Amino acid sequence: MRVDTSSAGPGGHGPRWPGRVAGWIRGHSLRLVALVVVATIAGSAAVVTDTLGAGYAFSRVVAHVQLWLDPPPDRPTVATVDVTPEPTDAPTQVPATVPGSPGATPVGSLATPARLPVDVNLVTDPDAVFISEIKDVWCAPAGTTIVLSILGHGTNTTAFETHLAGQIGQWDSWSDSHDGGWGPGAIALALGAYGVPGYQVRAYTTLASEMRDATLALTTTHEPVVLMAWYGAHTWVMTGYRASADPTIFHNATISGAYILDPWYPRVSSIWGRSAAPGVFHTMADLAVNVLPWRRPEGYYPARDLKFIAVVPTVVAAPAGAGQ
């Protein structure tokens, strides 16, 4: 074997760092150029003032550069399930009577419940379960911490949120979040890992369809729903709702809004304004300007783009500590 000592230290020993540095620069030249270009563009007035949408376009460039420099793992995650809206004008199902017994009491049921307004909320003391996101990009681990706290599988402490955020390496996936980190699939996987299995990522064509499905899931499982707000960039934890009637019985019940725990609180967003206090009721009009169809700057998500996304419970979780 021929040993090249041309750039070694005296006697052919010692570090060959000049050559190594040159090699590193050659191998990373494109990355260095990309970083310089991004930094230069970032300082332009058009980007700072978002002239003609330059700010949004630049955010896409930054996202793609970040993805290129440090791509997330390409591995399976929780699939996104497309939900077909149910007809809202379907008649309420009335149990049949025993054949040959006109006017008899319905079999296996009492009389049809009265159509009355409902006000449902899983949380009576929002402050007992709420925690703000420690970092302004930690809405997903904060929202997950809130859900686990509500269900008794976690605590609303900075220590727990920080620990949970540090576990993302177990659940991140390119298909779930192109720019790495937390996506709705990671939220579902994290909940399952901490004793709350069965959460499903669902996609809807309308906000009304999303809210109807969310109310059904929350009512039947007694577990919160995670709504992907702000075009999929943020998480809201839905703990209850108001409706003109019980949506599990009356298909055409009108949903008037939802109770929300927003991890962004007490911050103020330059785009979305001041976050509401934990547990505040949000009308459908308020939801309509915050819970918006998925549109992410880092790339395309065929199963999610332009759809309303939620992480929805499908089974009743075992009580914390069960089986121990």
Model-flagged regions — what are they?
Residues 116-170:
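Active-site nucleophile-adjacent alpha helix/oxyanion-hole segment immediately C-terminal to the catalytic cysteine
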